[in-house]
Amino acid sequence: MVLLALGFNCITYYGTRLITGGFHHHNMSTKLDLIIPLVPWTIIIYLGCYLFWIANYWMGSIQDEDETAAFLCADLCAKIVCFILFITVPTTIVRPEIPDTDIMNKAMLFLYSIDTPDNLFPSIHCLTSWFCVIAVRKQKTIPDWYKVLSVIIALAICVSTLTTKQHVVVDTFAGIALAELAYLFVKKSGILGPYKKLVSAIESFIISICKGHKQ
């Protein structure tokens, strides 16, 4: 299940760029985005998110079978929506000019050089960070202080997407909303059964291939 989630995440974020390269990209910046300042040091939060993601997705994947399946199915459903939106509503952002004066500015320039300003709506940074909140909030074995800390970290990451000028406000809210809606959809729709069958079929296929290579 985890491999399926990771695989589709890569397809969503990187694969769609192969399709939308020549498309017109919309700028969803608002007046509020113009007010929000560039704060280069927040790149530490922006890039440090991966440690948070690994920890909380691991916690979300070791719950009881139904909760783990619901969490990962919601993640997959959300990424499918992202895939559709990245193609149908391609967006971009106008990044500020940053002087090459100190280490944080250099880090920002490096980030801009490796991450093109597209696939922004909704923000996958915010989406994934909020799924980290969903992953732990119902687990009785996880202390309340960590659940609160997860919310704080997730919100800090969302803010960092704005202060690094990687996203605009609508992207961040859309990411959080999509995470909640995807999880609610999985819980209410009955899609969990077909999802489990799909995962089981994929796992059986992979196992059969591995056995074939060994022989």
Question: Each PLM stretch: what is its role?
Answer:
Residues 143-155:
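Short hydrophobic alpha-helices at membrane interfaces in multi-pass membrane enzymes
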Residues 16-31, 61-145, 193-215:
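Membrane-interface loops
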